[in-house]
Amino acid sequence: MVRVTFSTEQKVKEYSGKVTGFDILQPDALKEVVALKVNGELYDLSREIEADAEIEVIQLSDEVGLDIIRHDAAHIMAQAVKELFPNTQITIGPTIQDGFYYDFATDRTFTTDDLTAIEKKMKEIVKSNHRFVREVWTRKQSVDFFSGIGEKYKVDIISSIPEGENLTVYRQGDFVDLCRGPHSPSTGRVKAFKLMKVAGAYWRGDSKGPMLQRIYGTAWGNKDELNAYLECLKEAEKRDHRKIAKDMDLFHIQEEAVGQVFWHEQGYILYNVLESYIRKKLINNGYFEVKTPILVSKELWERSGHWDKFRENMFIVDESENKKLAIKPMNCPCHVQIFNSHTRSYRDLPIRMAEFGTCHRNESSGSLHGLMRVRGFTQDDAHIFCMEEQVNSETIKFCDLLKEVYSELGFNEISVKFSDRPDIRAGNDEVWDRAEKALLEAVKEAGLSYKLNPGEGAFYGPKLEFVLKDAIGRNWQCGTLQVDFILPERLGAFYIGADGHKHHPVMLHRAILGTFERFIGILIENYAGKFPVWLAPTQLAILTITNEADGYATEISNILKEQGVRVKTDLTNEKISYKIRLHSSNKVPILWIVGKNEVTSKTVSVRNLGSERQESFSLEKANESLLKSINLN
């Protein structure tokens, strides 16, 4: 007897023996269902359920369901490539955000024409509606099969799987691939897909290993979703922060300093405006600011645990007075040193310590991407040292601050990923229970929706990741809050409790922006360079029509500068139409145009970015409107 409980309905069905999803679900429901979750594990609809189970239905409209369809598409692509180019060897084909890829070993260089042919073949395979058939094989069966058909990379993967563990393969028509699954019932479920590009990749990510060709694709639940995504990509290309930054003269990156930013005048103004804004928020919320060294002894990184876990990503200075030093990849161990510089009492807690900390990480050159992925960066980093019973209230305060900052920067759609305890972790379950409960209650009280990432917390504590949605619907994970029970203990941090004894504080690692570099990249793309007036590097440009207006324009400029307005004055002899085009292309939000008439009447002609309309205002009225648009409140 097998008892099946449907988690959403709490409805129980009993069966005389083993059953599958096809047995359990009604035929009409099967059209939208791609898989099941059985006691928390994903199952194909054809996989047998052998014991009592709680069932959750996975539909195509679910995030997990769409991920399964993309996994299907990766297998279909691999089959298409093998049919078109039989000498190609297949390696791995996972899903990624918005799509999938598959790595192929071949002497052939895939072209755009090849992608067209592969896509056509994929459509034929979809039309054939081959069933995805799961089979459990022994290790020997798997090695014999894949070595027999010359798939050496699959044999290599099998060799890394523990001895005695059975393996699963999936068959679709004549094509067989090593795979954990799950898959949808058949290839016909993949309704809307497109191959996007070809890139190089190394086997197992090792630059010393064989070079492979990676084909990227995307797949969606229907053609409307696919077309919407492709339109979003076109819009994203127009908003590429690297292109806009070049047009606006914000920054550049060059080979002599790979992954590090050369901020130009306008870009650094933007950077400083953002930093000043965050600094004010921190001060108003009870933080104090510190500055810690960039070069720190290996000994501290060993004690903190970063040397073992993070050494490959650290820049090492071999010798300095017989000491090995490392450029810091993060600020937290240094902040503990400041905490440890005094004896702390429970009355001092919480301590909110902030730093605009410059860090460096040795990211691979292939992963670098404009401001979005760099080697040298500055974090809006802060650490809150508190007692365990203060975790909830501090998390609520942080969530409120984060929501306020995101909203004022133009992001009102925020979601949260909550990562709870991993299998391997420090601390006892009671401590984890309290920490997880404190975070979840704080998120709910802040009015934020969250998604559970089971087992994805760090070994030293649970984690919140804050995801914002931009103007074209893309999600960006920026803010974080991480509970840490371990680092204060490792580095000897303590406070004197009400009982007169020493206690280790809980440490909350938190950031709102993440890094200034990446967040500025996100801001550029969100606004397409057309920043709100308060944030714009140049808030106003005064353009003269004639030299007779130069003195008036300069006088206005000086008044505005005294008021803190970031203003430029264009007194060149160029035609006014050229000046308007120039400063509009530089995304200056407001233009004041002055000529003989404006000088006489003490007025300005106001033109806003993106509009061809000009309106005449008295200088007093225009100034009042300008200051109002600059003021956040």
From Swiss-Prot:
Chain spans, region Catalytic: 240-532
InterPro entries in the record: aa-tRNA-synt_IIb (IPR002314), aa-tRNA-synth_II (IPR006195), aa-tRNA-synth_II/BPL/LPL (IPR045864), Anticodon-bd (IPR004154), Anticodon-bd_dom_sf (IPR036621), Beta-grasp_dom_sf (IPR012675), TGS (IPR004095), TGS-like (IPR012676)
Any single GO CC term annotated in Swiss-Prot or TrEMBL for this entry: cytoplasm
Location within or outside the cell: Cytoplasm
PROSITE patterns named in the record: AA_TRNA_LIGASE_II (PS50862), TGS (PS51880)
Reactions accelerated catalytically: tRNA(Thr) + L-threonine + ATP = L-threonyl-tRNA(Thr) + AMP + diphosphate + H(+)
Essential cofactor(s): Zn(2+)
Gene3D superfamilies: 3.10.20.30, 3.30.54.20, Anticodon-binding domain, Bira Bifunctional Protein, Domain 2, Threonyl-trna Synthetase, Chain A, domain 2
Entry EC no(s): 6.1.1.3
GO MF terms held by the record: ATP binding; metal ion binding; threonine-tRNA ligase activity; tRNA binding
Cofactor binding annotation: Binds 1 zinc ion per subunit.
Annotated GO biological process: threonyl-tRNA aminoacylation
UniProt binding sites for Zn(2+): C332, H383, H509
Domain TGS: from-to ranges: 1-59
Quaternary structure note: Homodimer.
Task of the protein: Catalyzes the attachment of threonine to tRNA(Thr) in a two-step reaction: L-threonine is first activated by ATP to form Thr-AMP and then transferred to the acceptor end of tRNA(Thr). Also edits incorrectly charged L-seryl-tRNA(Thr).
NCBIfam families: thrS
Annotated protein name in UniProt: Threonine--tRNA ligase
Organism listed in the record: Wolbachia pipientis wMel
Lineage, broadest ranks: Bacteria, Pseudomonadati, Pseudomonadota, Alphaproteobacteria, Rickettsiales
Gene this protein is translated from: thrS
